[in-house]
Amino acid sequence: MNPNKASRPVFDASAVLALMHGEPGADRLKAVQPDAVVSAVNAAEVLAKLVSRGMPAAEAQAAYEALHFETTPFEPAMAAISARYVRKGVSLGDRCFLAAAERNGSGWTSDRDLGTLFGGRVPALNYFR
C-alpha cells in the first residue's frame, strides 16, 4: 500500500458500489483498490445509497468497512477546489470526488461526463466501465 495519500487514487461512490455489488468493471477496480482512498463525502453517499435501497444503516456501515478503504477527511482546501466545479451543474458528491481526485492526481468513476466538463483539470480520471 502506498502511504502517500496525495498520490493514491480516489474512488467515487459509483466505484465503491460497483465493488460491493460485483458490477461490470469491478475487476478493474479490484486491481487498484489496495492503494485507493475514498473521501468521507463519497463514503456518506455510498451509505445513503445503500440505506435508501432498504439496507439497515448498521449493515450498510459494516458492508462499507468490509472493503477496508481508507476514508479521508474532506478538508477546507478541498472545499475551495470543489467550489470551482459548481458552475458546471455538478452534484455535491461529484464535486467532492473531483476535488479529492485533483488533489491526489487521479480518480476512478463510471461517469465519463466528468472528464469532458473540465478541460483536463483533473490529471487522470479513469473509467471502470
Please identify what each model-predicted range represents.
Residues D27-P34, Y64-L67, S82-V86, A99-R103, ...:
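Alpha-helix C-terminal capping segments
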Residues E70-R112:
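Active-site neighborhoods of divalent-metal-dependent phosphate/nucleic-acid chemistry enzymes
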Residues V16-L17, A43, L114-G115:
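A generic structural signal for short hydrophobic patches within well-formed alpha-helices
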Residues S14, E23, A40, E75-P76, ...:
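Alpha-helix N-cap/helix-start capping motif
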Residues M1-N4, L98-R129:
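Acidic, PIN/NYN-like endoribonuclease modules and their adjacent C-terminal/linker elements
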Residues M1-V38, L50-A62, A66, N126-R129:
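Short, well-structured N-terminal submotif of metal-dependent ribonuclease cores
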